[in-house]
């Protein structure tokens, strides 16, 4: 029956997810071990030593990010974390998040266009929302080809604020879009082959407990556009 099919599908996704995460953990560990062994053997130039050290640091950061996302998502789903909502300026946060990734988009010669209003106040957990926008901007950079374009736009819409992150990357088909926010989903497009299926699941969960929402429009080869909606605070005189 339908329930059995759904349980079977979930179990399959879970098994695929565990296998994928195991691979994701092994990959940076293998890199770190290989480059650390080369450094220990010696005989490298200063430039090579710096390059190897930077590679180890990048692999370590990738592993740390993945483990952090697993722990955060687990705590959110088990309701061990509740939002600590307080008023803050979303526009400033978006600027800060974008600048955090500036070196990455410049390295790929990406045209990063930020269209932000001067100031908009929201009542939310600032640290949690930082996870949302860092994930979306990071993904856009990751999946946008060199010389491509990314648009970060924020506008007020009635009692809401709408944030859009659009890219000119590989895009997704309908099947992938339907399940891109599922925790265990590993789609067939390059949007889901890179990474471990955690970032967007974490983004959606954070927004759900914050009274917000996220949606996506996309097509293969035409890029993707993620739209976040959050309730905004009334403007004061």
Residue ranges of predicted features:
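Short acidic helix/loop segment immediately C-terminal to the autophosphorylated histidine
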Residues: 40-47
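Short alpha-helical segment of the dimerization/phosphotransfer core of two-component systems
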Residues: 58-64
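Conserved catalytic submotifs in the C-terminal HATPase_c
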Residues: 84-89, 106, 111-121
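Short helix-loop "hinge" at the ATP-lid/N-box region of the Bergerat-fold HATPase_c
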Residues: 140-141
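Short beta-strand/loop element within the Bergerat-fold HATPase_c
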Residues: 147-159
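Short conserved segment of the HATPase_c
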Residues: 172-184, 204
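Conserved glycine-rich
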Residues: 211-212
């Amino acid at each position: 029956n339908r329930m059995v099919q759904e349980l079977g599908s979930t179990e399959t996704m879970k098994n695929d997810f565990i296998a994928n995460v195991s691979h994701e953990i092994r990959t940076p560990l293998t890199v770190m071990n290989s480059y650390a062994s080369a450094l220990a053997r010696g005989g490298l130039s200063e430039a090579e030593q710096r390059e190897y050290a930077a590679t180890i640091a990048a692999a370590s950061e990738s592993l740390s990010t993945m483990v952090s996302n697993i722990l955060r998502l687990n705590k959110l789903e088990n309701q061990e974390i509740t939002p600590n909502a307080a008023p803050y300026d979303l526009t400033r946060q978006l600027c800060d998040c974008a600048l955090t990734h500036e070196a990455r988009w410049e390295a790929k010669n990406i045209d990063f266009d930020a269209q932000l209003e001067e100031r908009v106040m929201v009542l939310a957990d600032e640290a949690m929302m930082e996870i949302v926008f860092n994930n979306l901007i990071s993904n856009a950079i990751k999946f946008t080809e060199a010389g491509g374009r990314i648009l970060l736009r924020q506008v007020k819409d009635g009692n809401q604020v709408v944030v859009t992150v659009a890219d000119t990357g590989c895009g997704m088909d309908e099947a992938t879009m339907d399940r891109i926010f599922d925790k265990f989903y590993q789609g067939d497009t390059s949007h889901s082959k890179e990474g471990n299926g955690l970032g967007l699941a974490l983004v959606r969960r954070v927004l759900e407990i914050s009274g917000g929402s996220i949606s996506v429009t996309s097509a293969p080869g035409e890029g993707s556009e993620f739209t976040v909606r959050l309730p905004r605070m009334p403007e004061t005189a």
